[in-house]
Amino acid sequence: MSKEVLEKELFEMLDEDVRELLSLIHEIKIDRITGNMDKQKLGKAYFQVQKIEAELYQLIKVS
């Protein structure tokens, strides 16, 4: 797989994962306001952060 293709795929994955994280953060914020904190959503958000970190690390290695 070429460097350009790998970078493109990594950017697409990052875009998708960042959007998912933003959605989760929005949901968590609403849950907090309504008093319905959901620890599962916090766990999912934390997992998304770890995925994003790994993808950024891969991007550094490829660049």
From Swiss-Prot:
SUPFAM superfamilies: Hypothetical protein D-63 (SSF109801). It comes from the Viruses. InterPro entries: D-63_sf (IPR037292), Helix_hairpin_bin_sf (IPR029012), SSV1_D-63 (IPR048986). Pfam families: SSV1_D-63. This protein may be involved in virus assembly. Homodimer. This is Protein D-63. It comes from Sulfolobus spindle-shape virus 1 (SSV1).
